[in-house]
Amino acid sequence: MDLSKYLTVSMILFLLGIWGIFLNRKNIIVMLMSIELMLLAVNLNFLLFSVYIDDCIGQLFALLILTVAAAESAIGLALLVVYYRIRGTIAVEFINLMKG
């Protein structure tokens, strides 16, 4: 198994996530999707090293990260839907106007 090719793919996914955050700082949904892409790149690293050293701990961590990421996405999207219903926009520059 050639680990360097897969790590390159994981690094590209992670850098695409960072690039997506810095490129589009106005839309919170794109930022949330970029963060999820970064989490998936980290998951891929856990899985690759788990297979490479023949240990199942990395696979368990990847499963844990997937469940946390799914919960984070669901909560984030639910908050965005409520915020959109109240304000009528989900632009990042208006989110800092929230009080409480």
Swiss-Prot record:
It is a multi-pass membrane protein. InterPro entries: NADH_UbQ_OxRdtase_chain4L/K, NUOK/Mnh_C1-like. Its EC number is 7.1.1.2. Keywords: Electron transport, Membrane, Mitochondrion, NAD, Respiratory chain, Translocase, Transmembrane, Transmembrane helix, Transport, Ubiquinone. It catalyses: a ubiquinone + NADH + 5 H(+)(in) = a ubiquinol + NAD(+) + 4 H(+)(out). It comes from the Eukaryota. The chain crosses the membrane at residues 3-23, 28-48, 61-81. It is found in: Mitochondrion membrane. The keyword Kinase does not apply. The keyword NAD applies. One of its GO terms (cellular component) is NADH dehydrogenase complex. Complex I is composed of about 45 different subunits. Belongs to the complex I subunit 4L family. Core subunit of the mitochondrial membrane respiratory chain NADH dehydrogenase (Complex I) that is believed to belong to the minimal assembly required for catalysis. Complex I functions in the transfer of electrons from NADH to the respiratory chain. The immediate electron acceptor for the enzyme is believed to be ubiquinone. This is NADH-ubiquinone oxidoreductase chain 4L. It comes from Prototheca wickerhamii.
